Amino acid sequence: MKRFQRILALATLALLAFAGAAQAQQRDKVVLMLNWYNYGEHAPFYLGLDKGFYRDEGIDLEIQEGRGSGATVQAVAAGSVQFGYADVGTMMKATAKGAPVKSVGILLQKSPMSAMGFADKNITKPADIVGKTVAVTPGDALSQLWPVFLKLNKIEESQVKTVSGDATTKRNAVVNGQADMLLGNVNDQKPIIEEQTGKPMRAVLFADYGVNTINAGIIASKDLIAKNPELVRRFMRASMKAVEATVKAPDDAVAAMLKVNPKAGNPKTLKTSLDATIPLYHTKETEKARPFQVELKDVSSTLDMMSQYGGIDAASKGKVDDYYTAEFVK
């Protein structure tokens, strides 16, 4: 009798193992490429992975760090990865030039773009920027919208001195006193400099003074959207849950990211970055909506601004459907 029970138990375990393996084989292998090396903004996707939200949707998810939104857009367009998390303005420029990609959900609906400096500079509003030296990176998204920000706030470009450099050079210019401010994202550069120096920074957000563009979102190839819309829907469903869980427990989200990538950064800095990101998920119009659900007028206004200042053909104005679909976040 005992021998029979032992055989039955072993058979049951084997059956469960087989069922588990079969279930794993049935999951869709999916790669999400981020826009950059890990920082706090990326934490929700790792929390979704840790909590099994993607697994529950039949997705075996791998998250890859990126090397800039441009590279992420190229990888999605080429079919090297299924999804990308990227700057939507960068995607719009690529799509306008023929890249077969589209956004399927907008996470950052308020732009993190800002002019920032140390708090002791007492720069709290656009007028305080007059007479200051600002470090910029020529050709990036911030530098393209900087003249618009100045114009809307009645500041002549000649009233502000600029120095040029990449992200590291800009940070060093501010830290070393060669510049009063730099153009950067409030959820990225700001916490890094605060960690580096131990001094508080203050940011003047473009979005608070007339220049708001939708920022980062999930992108997919038009081929994937057409051939496997159900996969896109499942991925977005899991991602929406992941962001909602992050808002409730940001510390857990940071811990989940560090579990996968222990070298992602200082936990405190990552948490500061995430805390600065969460308020960017919604505008006043979408504050009661779920994550990734954006107002179409905000997509349209961003496209218009990109057409006017970002190098996109003016013929693209108003053609929101070429760049974004709300089908998968309903």
Model-based region annotation:
Residues 89-90, 169-173, 177-265:
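Pocket-lining segment of extracytoplasmic ligand-binding domains
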